[in-house]
Design a protein with these regions (language model features):
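Hydrophobic helix-coil surface modules that form long, contiguous segments used
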Residues: 3-11, 16-161
């Protein structure tokens, strides 16, 4: 697994930026990864296309994963991960813009059931936060589609940022 941890000021090691908490920006990520891997980000996946990269002697196939534009945030909050992930999924009980919000907990492939406890609470927390805010929209963005959790790191989609 490859993942980012930009706190307190390491975003500048990954991409050119003003890496100060008071300076904020929105981000768009495209990442090229082996076809059998999964890429995760703070924002929902926009599209996946085959890569033109040659497979080399190993014959690997590659893909390009593009993610939606993020909300305005500090650089240290932006994060992504690439790995051999599996997930468990549920939906919120509450409806947002007429639909239930899918919630996913990602784990190392084969360990999905170990994410079940987190999943059972994640959708409840999303609904609770929306009740506290007295809104029919999930926090921040009604287009957000899932909460993602990976080992030792939490990646919050824009619905939880």
């Amino acid at each position: 697994m490859l993942s980012t941890q930009f706190q307190p000021c390491d975003a500048r090691r990954a991409f050119p930026c003003f890496d100060e908490p008071a300076l904020k920006a929105s981000f768009e990520l495209s990442i090229e990864i082996p076809d059998d891997q999964t890429a995760l980000c703070n924002t929902p996946e926009k599209e996946t296309t085959p890569s033109s990269r040659p497979g080399g002697s190993a014959g690997w196939k590659w893909k390009v994963v593009q993610f939606e534009k993020s909300l305005v945030m500090s650089t240290y909050l932006y994060t992504w991960a690439v790995g051999d992930f599996g997930y468990v999924e549920a939906e919120t009980e509450r409806r947002y813009s007429g639909r239930r919000l899918p919630v996913r907990v990602y784990t190392t492939k084969g360990l999905e059931e170990q994410g079940r406890y987190a999943l059972e609470h994640a959708w409840k927390i999303i609904d609770l936060l929306s009740e506290v805010r007295t809104s029919s929209q999930p926090p921040q963005d009604h287009d957000a589609d899932h909460l993602q959790a990976v080992p030792n790191r939490m990646l919050f989609s824009s619905c939880c940022t």
